[in-house]
Amino acid sequence: MSKLYTEIPEKLQQFISEQKIFFVATATADSRINLSPKGMDSLQVLGPNRVAWLNVTGSGNETAAHVQENPRMTLMFTAFQDNPMILRLYGTAKAIHKDDAEWQMLFPLFTPLPGARQIFDLNIDLVQTSCGMAVPVYDYVGEREQLNAWAAKKGEDGVKAYWKETHHTSLDGKPTRFA
């Protein structure tokens, strides 16, 4: 029931563009595994073996801490409507921050979001689909606006202060670039 690909076929690129949510998983050799839901129309397919997503401020910064030490990353998408399917993208990622040269090239590809803190650039070495027949059917209602409103109210300086206060280490004490 599963299929493996060495790149993202056109039909799966279309599937990705239609999804409202995806999940990202990372870990270091000795840390907890982090699995986070993402949305906000923050992901772009940059080619058959490359995707990037704009990461906004959240309650932690686990993904960035993990990628500095171990760049392995998995993204998962699942169909909640229509035909069932689960899509996983496996690869190695790099965290790109606002002071990195690549930021200037990649950031214009995204809708600007308040509190944006990194872009994760994922080079994909394996694509897998599986049936997804056990995934329930859900209806998309809309985006949550609380995070954008929170970041806009704090302003850029307030968000940076929040990063310094709360995002300098992961749950396992791994450093981030916000120390």
For the regions a protein language model found, what residue spans apply to each?
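Binding-site signature for planar aromatic cofactors or substrates
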Residues: 1-179
